[in-house]
């Protein structure tokens, strides 16, 4: 949506979105003593059911597995070590799924649990399988309940938070909108305790986030709000409009969408492949390129040729996704490389005409190259 569109226009888009992803944070699903709260879940499901009754497809991204497993295991504080977190998640996931299932059963609806890891999203074939599973659940009139598979995810290979997972899922399923629900009502331009604090109702680009802090007084650069803003920007950069608000306003968020902060999407929605390559794919290595090549692949939208590559980093094979770095090591984007790293080393800095006939294809074709600058 461009500058001519108002916040009311964007809220109307979210209000009428046919396919919507709704992410709910742990604190909105659990009560005191870290137990799953059926009452809180029932209230959320009531709003979800009302939205589905209006004709929308709803995909739920649910946090809360680790928190829900703490009380049954006798844990009084959130575990810090990976093994205990995974044990809590394995117990909590059962309680959480039962709570969702029982609540939706009041409306004669079935749920389907989908547990994902970062490696699932990072491998293209596994990402497609996840997409097909979610699509089939919807066709069979089951509500997909998605969560990170904390039981098997490692500290090195995980989404980090379900906000990012929700952003990735929203693009994976071609959602028309993403709603992020937590325990904060939106963004402010200064501490809300300050009488002059202004509620930030819309974010069009990064400039609108300067000095912004969370509705609960926490800085955007710290804690949970940082991940929510990051996820909202991730989804909006890919072309998905986002509404960020408190779970206390779930009925309003899924009703008239007149609450919270909205994030404007880019007009040009990224293709599924480019989004996956840029934000989800595993990378096999990196290519450092010169300033001329940076301009060619960003402003020019051209393919990356061997002449502009100054360094090959890591060992990789043709067809893998690699990071593309600028002269100072800054990340420019990602792309699917056409040659093995061992072959590329022999091609560095050479004009296409200087290369053997079998090596004259672009190193990264423009169709398989995503740059971050175009999504700012």
UniProtKB/Swiss-Prot annotation:
This is Glutamate 5-kinase. It comes from the Bacteria. It is found in: Cytoplasm. Residues 284-358 form the PUA domain. SUPFAM superfamilies: Carbamate kinase-like, PUA domain-like. One of its GO terms (cellular component) is cytosol. The gene is proB. Its EC number is 2.7.2.11. The keyword Transferase applies. Keywords: Amino-acid biosynthesis, ATP-binding, Cytoplasm, Kinase, Nucleotide-binding, Proline biosynthesis, Transferase. Disulfide bonds: none annotated. The keyword Flavoprotein does not apply. It is an enzyme of class 2 (transferase).
């Amino acid at each position: 949506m461009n500058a001519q569109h108002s916040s009311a226009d964007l809220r109307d888009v979210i209000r009428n979105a046919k396919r919507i992803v709704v992410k709910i944070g742990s604190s909105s699903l659990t009560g005191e003593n870290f137990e799953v709260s059926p009452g809180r879940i029932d209230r959320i499901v009531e709003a979800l059911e009302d939205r589905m009754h209006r004709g929308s497809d709803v995909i739920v991204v649910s946090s809360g597995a680790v928190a829900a497993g703490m009380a049954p295991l006798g844990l009084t504080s959130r575990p810090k070590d990976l093994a205990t977190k995974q044990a809590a998640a394995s117990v909590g996931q059962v309680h959480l799924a039962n709570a969702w299932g029982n609540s939706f059963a009041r409306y004669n609806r079935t749920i389907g649990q989908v547990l994902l890891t970062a490696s699932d999203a990072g491998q293209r074939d596994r990402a497609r399988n996840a997409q097909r599973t979610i699509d089939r659940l919807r066709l069979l009139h089951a509500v997909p309940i998605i969560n990170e598979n904390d039981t098997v995810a490692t500290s090195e290979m995980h989404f980090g938070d379900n906000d990012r997972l929700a952003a990735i899922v929203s693009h994976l399923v071609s959602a028309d909108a993403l709603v992020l629900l937590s325990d904060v009502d939106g963004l402010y331009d200064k501490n809300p305790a300050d009488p002059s604090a202004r509620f930030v109702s819309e974010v069009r680009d990064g400039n609108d986030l300067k000095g912004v802090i969370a509705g609960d007084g926490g800085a955007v650069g710290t804690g949970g709000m940082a991940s929510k803003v990051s996820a909202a920007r991730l989804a909006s950069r890919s072309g998905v409009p986002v509404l960020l608000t408190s779970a206390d306003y779930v009925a309003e968020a899924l009703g008239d969408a007149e609450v919270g902060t909205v994030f404007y999407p880019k007009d040009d929605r990224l293709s599924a492949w480019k989004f996956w390559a840029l934000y989800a794919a595993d990378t096999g290595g990196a290519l450092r390129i010169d300033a001329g090549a940076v301009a060619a692949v960003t402003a020019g939208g051209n393919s990356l040729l061997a002449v502009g590559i100054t360094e090959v980093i890591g060992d990789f094979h043709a067809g893998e996704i690699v990071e593309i770095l600028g002269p100072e090591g800054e990340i420019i984007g990602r792309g699917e490389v056409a040659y093995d790293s061992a072959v590329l080393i022999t091609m560095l800095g050479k004009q296409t005409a200087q290369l053997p006939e079998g090596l004259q294809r672009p190193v990264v074709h423009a169709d398989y190259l995503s740059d971050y600058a175009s999504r700012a």
